[in-house]
Design a protein with these regions (language model features):
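Conserved acidic carboxylate
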Residues: 7
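Acidic, metal-coordinating helix/loop segments flanking the phosphotransfer/catalytic sites
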Residues: 29-47
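Receiver (REC) domain active-site loop signature in two-component systems and cognate sites
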Residues: 54
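Short, glycine/charged-rich "phosphate-handling" switch motifs in NTP-dependent
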Residues: 98
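C-terminal output helix
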Residues: 105-114
């Protein structure tokens, strides 16, 4: 299973990437929403793990565009964020997200959390 990890913080991206690879995922990375859209078009990942706050295009706008495009609307989007307030989680879910994982996350169980959201 291929995951696109869109995260602008290099340390967080590294920890998440290594954790997901250790769990058996193939990981493609992007540093912002614009780059994430480009990578999705080129790579067609099975799941997208998306930070909310990124430069150039935030996660909300990235998710909105992904869900508006019939070619990518079916790819599960999971937000990875330090901001897990109820209103923001509700906004993410209204955009079509499969779920939200809070930061800091447990690197040992990140892959399992992703699978839980994808399985529904």
């Amino acid at each position: 299973m291929t995951i696109l990890l869109a995260e602008d913080e290099p340390d967080v991206q590294l920890i998440a990437r290594l954790s997901l690879k250790k769990a058996g995922f193939t990981v493609v990375t992007a540093g912002n929403g614009v780059e994430a859209l480009e990578r999705v078009a080129a790579e067609r990942p099975d799941v997208i793990l998306l930070d909310w706050m990124m430069p150039d295009m935030d996660g909300f706008e990235t998710c909105r565009r992904l869900k508006a495009d019939p070619a990518t609307a079916g790819i599960p989007v999971i937000f990875l964020t330090a901001r897990v307030q109820e209103a923001e989680v509700a906004r993410a879910m209204a955009l079509g997200a499969a779920g939200c994982i809070g930061k800091p996350f447990d690197a040992l169980t990140l892959g399992q959390r992703v699978l839980e959201f994808v399985a529904g």
